[in-house]
From Swiss-Prot:
Binds to DNA and alters its conformation. May be involved in regulation of gene expression, nucleoid organization and DNA protection. SUPFAM superfamilies: YbaB-like (SSF82607). GO terms for molecular function: DNA binding. It is found in: Cytoplasm, Nucleoid. It comes from Helicobacter pylori (strain Shi470). Keywords: Cytoplasm, DNA-binding. Homodimer. HAMAP family: DNA_YbaB_EbfC. Belongs to the YbaB/EbfC family. This is Nucleoid-associated protein HPSH_00175. It comes from the Bacteria.
């Protein structure tokens, strides 16, 4: 193993990770609940970027809370799953390390 190439490999991975993070920011994950009465959208870094609530729910606070929690939880899970997949893809590239 040639440790002199390790720095270059790490720099390359850091650059690739930054590019993936930037690209991931543009990815949108949308979750709906209550048959579409509530819709939330997160970008790939977990920021809530859109929230839609059907007007009919404005008079039913309890239902709105339940649907909001459900949609938010599903959206959060989608973002986390996407992050995990990106991390596994990055780790897959560590196979290049063994070739050094």
């Amino acid at each position: 193993m040639d440790f002199s190439q390790l720095g270059g490999l790490l720099d390359g991975m850091k650059k690739e990770f930054s590019q993936l993070e930037e690209k991931n920011k543009d990815t949108i994950h949308t979750s709906k609940s209550g048959g579409g009465m509530v819709s939330v959208s997160f970008n790939g870094v977990g920021e809530l970027v859109d929230l839609q609530i059907d007007d009919s729910l404005l008079e039913d606070k309890e239902a709105m809370q339940i649907y909001l929690m459900s949609a938010l939880n599903d959206g959060y899970k989608a973002v986390e799953e996407n992050r995990k997949n990106l991390a596994f893809n990055m780790l897959g590239n560590l196979g290049n390390f063994a070739k050094l």
